[in-house]
Amino acid sequence: MRVLGIDPGSRITGYGLVEQHGSRLVHLDNGAVFTDKAKDFPDRLRLIFEGLSRVIAEYAPDAVAVEDVYVSENVRAALKLGQARGAAIAAAVHAGLPVFEYTASQVKQAVVGQGRAGKEQVQKMVKALLGLPEIAQADASDAVAVAICHINSYQLRLQAGPAVATSRRASSWRNYRP
């Protein structure tokens, strides 16, 4: 299974591709889509959509996992983050891919084993799990963690059987039709 993980942001949207080979996780690529804050916001959303569409076309993932919006006291920032997530989800749905969403604490739990783990702990574990010396961009590292979270969660759902699969906490946009 090949998964594209996405850490959405209105300025920087990180992405990471991880593939599962048996019990091994293999890092394929990671990076970020950068937008220019001087541009108008709809144009920045277009850049996110187009950038992720290129990544999807190049790597042909089987699924996309997106970090869910966290609660923010800054309503304007939360709305912009939600719109950036929408652009990312639209790119995946446009390509016909299933989309799964995970909260930050679900990602941390799946990667580190603790839902309140710090960013540094997550980055360290991502590097250890994939045998990487470094991941240059923090947003890309977070996106790789989201991909790992989906692979681990997917495997657990398969092992647990249909009862868990129907009551999963991660939501899917697979059946969404505008």
From Swiss-Prot:
Annotated coiled-coil segments of the chain: none
Catalytic residues, per the record, are D7, E67, D139
Entry GO terms, CC: cytoplasm; Holliday junction resolvase complex
Q: Which UniProt keywords apply?
A: Cytoplasm, DNA damage, DNA recombination, DNA repair, DNA-binding, Endonuclease, Hydrolase, Magnesium, Metal-binding, Nuclease
Question: What is the enzyme's class at the highest EC level?
Answer: hydrolase
Note the superkingdom of the native organism.
Bacteria
**Entry annotated with the keyword DNA-binding:** yes
What is the reaction catalyzed?
Endonucleolytic cleavage at a junction such as a reciprocal single-stranded crossover between two homologous DNA duplexes (Holliday junction)
Q: Does the keyword Lyase apply?
A: no
* InterPro entries referenced in this protein's UniProt entry, alphabetically: RNaseH-like_sf, RNaseH_sf, X-over_junc_endoDNase_Mg_BS, X-over_junc_endoDNase_RuvC
Provide the residue positions that the database annotates as binding Mg(2+) 2: E67
Please tell me where Mg(2+) 1 binds in this chain.
Answer: D7, D139
Co-factor binding details = Binds 2 Mg(2+) ion per subunit.
Q: Which GO terms describe its biological process?
A: DNA recombination; DNA repair
What Enzyme Commission number(s) apply to this enzyme?
Answer: 3.1.21.10
Cited CDD domains: RuvC
Task: Identify the cofactor(s).
Answer: Mg(2+)
According to its UniProt record, where is this protein located? Cytoplasm
Q: Which GO terms describe its molecular function?
A: crossover junction DNA endonuclease activity; DNA binding; magnesium ion binding
Q: Which PANTHER family match?
A: CROSSOVER JUNCTION ENDODEOXYRIBONUCLEASE RUVC
Record note on quaternary structure: Homodimer which binds Holliday junction (HJ) DNA. The HJ becomes 2-fold symmetrical on binding to RuvC with unstacked arms; it has a different conformation from HJ DNA in complex with RuvA. In the full resolvosome a probable DNA-RuvA(4)-RuvB(12)-RuvC(2) complex forms which resolves the HJ.
This chain's function reads:
The RuvA-RuvB-RuvC complex processes Holliday junction (HJ) DNA during genetic recombination and DNA repair. Endonuclease that resolves HJ intermediates. Cleaves cruciform DNA by making single-stranded nicks across the HJ at symmetrical positions within the homologous arms, yielding a 5'-phosphate and a 3'-hydroxyl group; requires a central core of homology in the junction. The consensus cleavage sequence is 5'-(A/T)TT(C/G)-3'. Cleavage occurs on the 3'-side of the TT dinucleotide at the point of strand exchange.
Which family does the UniProt entry place this protein in?
Belongs to the RuvC family.
List the protein's name: Crossover junction endodeoxyribonuclease RuvC
Native organism is: Trichlorobacter lovleyi (strain ATCC BAA-1151 / DSM 17278 / SZ) (Geobacter lovleyi)
